[in-house]
């Protein structure tokens, strides 16, 4: 199973295509300066050289399209078509107290992420843009949200609430 992992920022998009069975990174890259003059994509297939291409990316949707183009490219691509991408995992900075693990993205999850925008105003709105952009390009591919804050949900309560070591 090939999983496209996306970390979407306000003007950048990092990605890796990972084979979940072998855990190998098939390709990775970075779209920079999205919505700004001089935007480019740097793409590196497994075992290959980094390829940097200047390309106009006025929106995140165009950045996602550029990623798919590189992943399926005849020379530097690692899959033949979009059909070989089985799911997309989105790194989400803040899920509040609602999410203790990764979840399949639906309308309720989108609303809950949006409700946390005040907790991560530089990140969550960009994460939502990334999800919507991927949905536009890959409407039939399952999308999963992976929350930074879920890590903290599994900590013992005393470690979560206090910064000092717990008494022995």
Write out the residue ranges for each language-model feature.
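Extreme N-terminal starter segment of soluble prokaryotic enzymes
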Residues: 1-3
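A short acidic Gly-Thr/Ser loop motif
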Residues: 6-11
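Short glycine-rich, Thr/Ser-proximal phosphate-binding strand/loop in the N-terminal lobe
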Residues: 12-57
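A structured beta-alpha segment of the ubiquitous adenosine-cofactor-binding alpha/beta core
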Residues: 53-81
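Short beta-strand-loop/turn "lid" adjacent to the catalytic site in phosphate-handling enzymes
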Residues: 71, 77-123, 144, 151-159
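Polyanion-binding loop/helix "lid" in catalytic or ligand-binding cores
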Residues: 123-135, 146
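Conserved small/polar residues in nucleotide/adenosyl-binding loops
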Residues: 162-167
